[in-house]
């Protein structure tokens, strides 16, 4: 029994010191070092995510540098574009020094300045009345065109250095035209002008009215601030003649026409078309320009487009 136990113990000890399969025999320190290196490679292959802190820090640092350079390029590009835009605006102001705006003025300041000018015109400026009492027979298309003309008229008056006070008469807030103005004109309900259902003949003393109509026998010579100038708010594609003239005659109101015949001549065109009928915003542009410059040729050039078949006398040869 003692001999068998001793042999069993020897076999156990022999197995305990047996080399692992696949590894080279332990041949001193070199063989042992080589074995540990192979084991280390296996461990790193099985867990590649375990990188050294030093390598991770280097990679993170390079990534941050790339992001920083990318961000700096974006910032530099934006600065360059802003500089170019400032230079473009500066050059534009140099080309047109009389545009009436200052770069240091904010939109809020300019809005307040415009409001102040318009309110001052209400008390001391010339008055312009747009007679909208003839819109009941106008089509939807004609109403839309008239709403657009009202918007352009108001826009021109806001930009004028000496604005008129505008009054829209015979204008019901329940009318299709009012709805069209709200639809087409942003902020229409906040326009600085008067809106009333009364017609101009009952709102103002008749002796203060001058109805502007192309059918009048009298030419408008000057603008008087004590006079209320009336424009017929009428867009009529069928071109009914003398509608506004007859209405003025009905109330025994003075009439006048723009001095187109005095300062302009007919120019030959393919359609042989010549007309003194203008949109209300074109009539206003002429009145506003004349009120600022006191120069009829300049004012007429502003409002009478070449399509009307008229040119200024001194430019007829062109």
Curated annotation (Swiss-Prot):
Residues 64-83 have a biased composition (Basic residues). GO terms for biological process: methylation; protein insertion into mitochondrial inner membrane. The keyword Methyltransferase applies. It catalyses: guanosine(9) in tRNA + S-adenosyl-L-methionine = N(1)-methylguanosine(9) in tRNA + S-adenosyl-L-homocysteine + H(+). This is tRNA methyltransferase 10 homolog B. Belongs to the class IV-like SAM-binding methyltransferase superfamily. TRM10 family. Residues 72-93 form a coiled coil. Residues 1-105 are annotated as: Disordered. Transmembrane segments: none annotated. Its EC number is 2.1.1.221.
